[in-house]
Amino acid sequence: DCGIQTLLFMTLARLNGIPVHWQSGFDLKPGEDNLHDWCEMYLEPYGWVLVDQSYGIKNSRDERVKWFCLGNTDPYRWIVNDDFSQPLYPAKIYPRSETVDFQRGEVEWRGGNLYFDAWEYDYHIEYMSE
């Protein structure tokens, strides 16, 4: 799970004095769109750089490809969250379905929370070409 991997990476980085923060959203590669979690870490002199440990080090002889997921981003990433487990506004009355992320939203009614299997969401992606 990319969220657990990200939280583990962030914990290990912080234990070693490396500033990190959470990001999550959607990975919108054609044919592979899905929810996704990753983080950024602060590296002098570059500032905040993306780290996507879920994809790891690529098996490539090309060093640019091999290390791409450390400090680079692809054009298919849609950032929705810059932190995790934050309060919602307006506040929910019932417990949240997702306590860490907030990519797909939350739904509740006067009878309680509606977990993800009780409702659907959809999105349409239009890829632009030059």
Tell me what each language-model feature is:
Residues 48-49, 76, 80-130:
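N-terminal accessory/pre-domain segments preceding catalytic cores
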Residues 4-94:
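Hydrophobic/aromatic-rich core segments of domains that either
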